């Protein structure tokens, strides 16, 4: 279903009541979206694979050779997300490049100028070109390798994005198509109500201090950064200064 220029929603199965967009109260910026071009989507609904079972829902979305993907919200361990397994799951202290983060999102951008939002609030898994269907691994000839080189020859990355949503029996997939990545992202923002420009320092460089730093140690770090002319717009204070942290014991009457 076309929702606006460059914005399409495909509904598969029975979407859950609670999801990223279904639980939000927002008004799309339709006037601004109407002023934009209406580019052709990179792929059709028929090219999206969908299946569901007692375990949940699986989607497959096209991915062309050379296409690079970015996104999935805050990712502390990597920038480009092509050829990876991403678990969209909240985690305050991710230790590996698995997709866990403080603010993950079931959303990715492509260098082909489109973005995809899989509207789910569950811990979904995305395989971004790192998996292949068994019937496509060997290619057209499907010949069994006869030596070490043939058996372990690189067959290239997968040609699809696989999405697994546990327990769900369906979901909405939003496709935002633009002239380039920036334009696709703009359509996503406008459709979700538009963004607010934060103060410029909020877009600056953030330095977070060690958990057990005291006020004196934090002040010392700030002075050293300034003395060395190192740019820093924000200092993050970890909750070690609380009486107890996680969950914290912040008490207003002490300040």
PLM features per residue range, with description:
Residues 1-199, 209-211, 215-216, 222-227:
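Catalytic and substrate-binding clefts that recognize carbohydrates or anionic sugar/phosphate headgroups
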């Amino acid at each position: 279903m076309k929702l606006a220029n460059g914005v399409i929603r495909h509904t598969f199965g029975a979407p859950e009541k609670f999801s990223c967009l279904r639980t939000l109260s927002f008004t799309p910026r339709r006037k601004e979206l109407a002023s934009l071009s209406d580019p052709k989507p990179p792929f059709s609904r028929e090219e999206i694979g969908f299946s569901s079972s007692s375990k949940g829902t699986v989607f497959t979305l096209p991915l062309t050779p050379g296409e690079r993907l970015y996104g999935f919200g805050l990712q502390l361990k990597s920038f480009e997300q092509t050829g990876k397994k991403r678990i969209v799951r909240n985690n305050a202290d991710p230790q590996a490049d698995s997709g866990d983060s403080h603010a993950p999102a079931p959303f990715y951008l492509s260098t082909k100028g489109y973005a995809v939002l899989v509207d789910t609030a569950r811990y979904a898994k995305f395989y971004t070109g790192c998996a292949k269907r068994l019937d496509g691994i060997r290619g057209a000839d499907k010949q069994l390798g006869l030596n070490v080189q043939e058996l372990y020859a690189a067959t290239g990355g997968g040609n699809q994005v696989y999405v697994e949503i546990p327990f769900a029996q369906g979901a909405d997939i939003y496709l935002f198509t633009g002239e380039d990545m920036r334009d696709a992202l703009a359509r996503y923002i406008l459709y979700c109500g538009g963004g607010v420009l934060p103060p410029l320092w909020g877009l600056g460089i953030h330095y977070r201090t060690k958990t057990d730093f005291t006020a004196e140690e934090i002040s010392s770090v700030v002075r050293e950064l300034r003395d060395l002319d190192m740019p820093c717009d924000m200092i993050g204070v970890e909750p070690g200064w609380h009486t107890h942290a996680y969950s914290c014991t912040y008490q207003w009457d002490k300040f």
